[in-house]
């Protein structure tokens, strides 16, 4: 069956089974010659024949060197035994003790090495019988050597009956020795996917992100992936209805899961910089569910992340929102019914400031050009919409005589923005560009949902609020390139004080595992309250992603995306004990 899967079956699928895929009279002379049985673990392909022409892959050793020899070297004589398989020879030198020898033969070129009391002896020679050559002793002296055969290797002779029995034998029985399988097939993969549990947390400090705030010595219950009760009284009413696993949270803190608004984990090669607009590409087509960073970020309390296209062009690709369901396939990682997003970008990256002298061709090359890319794209999208609108109004007979407009996946995505069906998250730094894009959006009839990074957001907070944009920034990143020199660690707190929905993001696989510490910096530098700072990585990114009705706080009916902390979640000394 395995052989047919490689030969006759694909030949049949390709419609060429009358000439290929089997060894029969009249078929094309395509076959391979092997050293051992076809599926032997140590088999080698010796020749590959294509249309009757042989191509040598691994030349077969012409001479069998196995046997008994005498080694003459430096005035001494030693017995030498060469054994093993023809393609994998072993040798032994016999003196007072038996010494293992490395013996390699490639046709008539011989290489020998062994260890004596002084170190390594290396010999190189040629021939069949005798073998002659030069070598270097362990003391560094060069000498000649001679190897003379005493007795050849006695091959096992098989009878005609034995050969016929082998040829006429039935199919080989393949044992299922693959062992246990898990997914992902990497470290920390599951043998069986974990089931949703009924869990009751008691005596724990709750960070609710609701009007109740932080509640000490409280309780919370979850069932079938949902929060079913919050608070001691509510839990008391239902504690006997289900078989809960009870977790004593004394001294511990329970919060909603961390949400990373800007991530690039579980992706690879998703910076389509070949053109100024690549809105047709989708991160959901490139997700790698076996990325170990999913597991690591779960260990840091992250439960949801928005996977973004890179920032190589003004209009990038479509985003993907995932839940960190380690061990699931791509479809199960994707967040159900999430509002679709697309990545935009401004600044040095899109005008190719640091791309080198050979990247001076693609438009735009200036910040002025970036603005025109946006206008050009959305004007084309509106014209595209008019063409399709006119086409849809035609009768069936008119459509037969006419020509249907060309389908454009790039413009389809931009149309979704104009119709309010898709949101934008935009890579941004400088106030002038942030202001420019808001003006473009206002004039074209759409809104920028999120300015991400936005390190000069504190300069344009009033205009952002008037436009209706949110902010997903870094806590204290600064001076890693020229356009971020005006960044300040107070930015997040100032934006929050202005009434703008503000979040902290990672943009980095390692940073995401410590987003709780990033949130703490809003308290340290900006004077934000602990509860507001905690919302920067939980409720506020949920609002920016339009999923706050399902997650981001501890409320009855919301998803049980939870993190149990060993201590205060904003402390650098606290660790994640459990993530749900």
Regions found by a protein language model. Name each.
Residues 60-79, 89-96, 102, 131-142, ...:
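Tryptophan-anchored aromatic micro-motifs
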Residues 1, 12-14, 35-36, 40-51, ...:
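Active-site core of metal-dependent hydrolases
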Residues 1-28, 32, 189-190, 270, ...:
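His/Asp/Glu-enriched, well-ordered alpha-helical/loop segment
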Residues 18, 38, 44, 50, ...:
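Polyanionic/metal-chelating signatures
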Residues 100, 212-255:
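Histidine-rich, glycine-flanked metal-binding segment
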Residues 28-61, 204, 555-580:
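C-terminal cap of metal-dependent C-N hydrolases
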Residues 39, 136-180, 184-185:
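Edge beta-strand at a domain terminus
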């Amino acid at each position: 069956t395995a052989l047919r899967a490689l030969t006759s079956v694909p030949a049949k699928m390709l419609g060429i089974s009358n000439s290929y895929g089997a060894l029969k009279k009249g078929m094309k002379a395509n076959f391979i010659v092997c050293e051992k049985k076809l599926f032997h673990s140590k088999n080698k392909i010796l020749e590959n024949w294509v249309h009757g022409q042989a191509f040598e892959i691994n030349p077969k050793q012409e001479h069998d060197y196995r046997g008994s020899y005498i080694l003459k070297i430096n005035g001494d004589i030693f017995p030498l035994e060469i054994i093993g398989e023809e393609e994998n020879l072993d040798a032994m030198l016999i003196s007072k003790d038996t010494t293992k020898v490395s013996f390699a033969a490639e046709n008539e070129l011989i290489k020998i090495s062994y260890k004596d009391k002084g170190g390594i002896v290396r010999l190189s020679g040629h021939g069949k019988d005798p073998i002659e050559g030069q070598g270097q002793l362990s003391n560094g002296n060069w000498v000649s050597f001679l190897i003379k055969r005493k007795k050849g290797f006695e091959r096992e002779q098989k009878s005609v009956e034995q050969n016929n029995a082998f040829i006429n034998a039935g199919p080989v029985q393949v044992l299922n020795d693959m062992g246990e399988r898990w997914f992902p097939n990497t470290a920390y993969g599951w043998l069986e996917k974990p089931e949703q549990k009924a869990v009751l947390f008691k005596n724990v400090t709750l960070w609710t992100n609701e009007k109740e705030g932080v509640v000490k010595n409280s309780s919370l219950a979850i069932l079938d992936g949902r929060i079913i009760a919050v608070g001691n009284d509510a839990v008391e009413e239902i504690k006997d209805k289900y078989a809960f696993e009870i977790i004593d949270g004394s001294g511990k803190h329970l919060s909603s899961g961390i949400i990373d608004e800007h991530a690039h984990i579980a992706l690879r090669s998703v910076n389509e910089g070949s053109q100024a607009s690549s809105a047709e590409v989708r991160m959901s087509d490139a997700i790698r569910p076996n990325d170990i960073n999913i597991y690591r970020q779960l260990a840091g309390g992250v439960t949801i992340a928005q996977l973004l296209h890179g920032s190589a062009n003004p209009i990038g690709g479509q985003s993907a929102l995932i839940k960190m369901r380690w061990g699931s396939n791509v479809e199960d990682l994707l967040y159900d019914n999430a509002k679709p997003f697309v990545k935009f970008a401004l600044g040095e990256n899109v005008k190719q400031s640091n791309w080198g002298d050979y990247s001076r061709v693609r438009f735009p090359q200036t910040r002025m050009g970036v603005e025109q890319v946006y206008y050009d794209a959305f004007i084309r999208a509106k014209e595209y919409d008019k063409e399709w609108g006119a086409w849809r109004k035609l009768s069936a007979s008119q459509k037969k005589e006419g020509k249907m407009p060309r389908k454009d996946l790039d413009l389809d995505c931009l149309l979704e923005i104009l119709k309010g069906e898709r949101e934008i998250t935009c890579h941004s730094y400088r106030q002038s560009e942030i202001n420019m894009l808001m003006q473009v959006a206002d004039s074209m009839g759409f809104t920028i949902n999120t300015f991400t990074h936005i390190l000069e957001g504190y300069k344009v907070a009033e205009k952002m609020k008037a436009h209706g944009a949110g902010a997903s920034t870094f806590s204290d990143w600064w001076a890693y390139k020229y356009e971020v020199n005006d960044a300040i660690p107070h930015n997040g707190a100032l934006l929050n004080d202005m009434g703008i929905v503000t979040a902290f993001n990672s943009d980095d696989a390692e940073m995401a595992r410590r987003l709780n510490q990033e949130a703490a910096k809003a308290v340290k530098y900006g004077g934000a309250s602990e509860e507001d700072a905690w919302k920067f990585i939980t409720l506020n990114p949920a609002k920016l992603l339009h999923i706050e009705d399902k997650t981001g706080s501890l409320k009855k009916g919301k998803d049980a995306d939870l993190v149990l902390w060993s201590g205060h979640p904003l402390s650098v000394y606290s660790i994640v004990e459990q993530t749900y």
